[in-house]
Amino acid sequence: MERWAAPKVTAGSARRYVADQPSFSSTLLDAIYKSMDEQPGHGGGATGVEAVAAAAKKQHEAALHYGNYYKPSLAGSYRARAPGPHATTSSSSECSSYGGFSSSEAESSHHRRLRPIRTTVPGGAPGPAPEKKAKKPGASIRAKLRDLRKPASPGARLAGFLNSIFAGKRAPATPPSATAGAESACSTASSYSRSCLSKTPSTRGQAKRTVRFLDSDTESLASSTVVDRRRVPVEAVQQMLLQRMEMESDEDDDESSDASSDLFELENFAAIAPAGAAYRDELPVYETTRVALNRAIGHGYGHGRSARVV
C-alpha cells in the first residue's frame, strides 16, 4: 500500500486550523457578538450574555473531551486497523467531519504498531529436567548377583577364558629388585662394603641355611649313589616286564598244544628213507592248517628238510 503524501501547511491552512480550534476567549467573544447581532433592540443583554457564556463553556468542554479522550482512542484504532507496521493517514474530509482532525495531527499519530504482551507460557516449552536418582551401593551388588544367576552361554565362557588368558599375559612391570638397587648404590669399594653391611636383610623368623664343603671323592660317591637310586626302579620294571612276557608265552604254548584240530602227528619219510629223493616228487604233507606255517613247511620239504613242527 502506497503512503499518502502529507499536504503542505500554508499560511491559509494555519489560520483555518486556528479557526477550527478557537480558544475559550475567542469563542466567548464570538457568542457575544452573535447575540448582539440577533437581538439589537432587546434590553435583556445580561441574559443573552449568560446564554452565550454557557454555550461557549459547553463548546470548550466538548473540545477538551475530544482532545483528551476521543483523539487518543481514534489514533489507537487507526494503528490497530493498519495492515502493516505503519498506520495510514486520514483524508482531509475525515479531518473536517471529526471537528478539525487535520493531516498534520494524523502524521503525528504515525507510530509503529505495538506488539502484544505475552502472558501465557507456550505449550512446547521444555519442562524442568528431572533430577537424577542417586544410585544405591546395594543396587550394583544385586545387579552383579542377578548376572551370575543367569546361565552362561558357551560363547560367553570362551570369551571370558580368552580374556583371562590375555589379562594374565599383560602382567604389570615388576619393580626393580633390591639387589639391583644395592649394586647401583655401591659405586666404589668402600661404599660397597658399607652399604652391604648396612643393607643385610634380617634372618629373624626365616629358615636357617647350612653350607657344607665336600671333596671330589665324596662328591663322586654321592652322585653315583643318586644314579644307582635312579637305576634301581628301571631295572626292576624291566625284570617285571620280562617275567610277564614269559608267562604269556607259556600260556600261548599250552593253548596251542591242547588244540587237536590244529596239529597232526605225521612223519616225514623223506628225511629217514634211503631213497629220499623218491618223496620229493610227491605233494608235501602238512601237520597244521595254518597258511603261514604251511608255506614254511613246503619250502623246507622241497629242500629235503623235515617238515614236522613241534
Swiss-Prot record:
Question: Keywords, A to Z?
Answer: Auxin signaling pathway, Cell membrane, Membrane, Transport
Instruction: Give the gene name.
Output: BG1
Q: Which InterPro entries match?
A: BG1-like
**What's the biotech application?**
Good candidate to improve plant biomass and grain productivity in various species.
The molecule here is called Protein BIG GRAIN 1
> Which segment of the chain is annotated as a signal peptide?
none
Q: Say what the protein does.
A: Involved in auxin transport. Positive regulator of the auxin signaling pathway involved in gravitropism, plant growth and grain development.
Biological process (GO) annotations held by this record are: auxin transport; auxin-activated signaling pathway; gravitropism; positive regulation of auxin mediated signaling pathway; regulation of seed growth; response to auxin
Q: What family classification does the UniProt entry report for this protein?
A: Belongs to the BIG GRAIN 1 (BG1) plant protein family.
Record's GO cellular component terms? plasma membrane
Induction profile: Rapidly induced by auxin (IAA) and analogs, indole-3-butyric acid (IBA) and naphthylacetic acid (NAA). Expression level is gradually decreased as the panicle matures.
List the PANTHER family hit by this protein, alphabetically: PROTEIN BIG GRAIN 1-LIKE A, PROTEIN BIG GRAIN 1-LIKE A-RELATED
Its organism's taxonomic lineage begins at: Eukaryota, Viridiplantae, Streptophyta, Embryophyta, Tracheophyta
Additional notes on this entry: The over-expressing mutants Bg1-D and BG1-OE exhibit increased grain size with both bigger length and width, and associated with longer epidermis cells of both palea and lemma in spikelet hull as well as increases of both number and area of the parenchyma cells in the hull. Some genes associated with cell cycle and cell expansion are up-regulated in the panicles. Enhanced growth of other tissues at both the vegetative and reproductive stages are also observed. Increased sensitivity to auxin (IAA) in terms of root elongation/inhibition, as well as altered IAA distribution and transport.
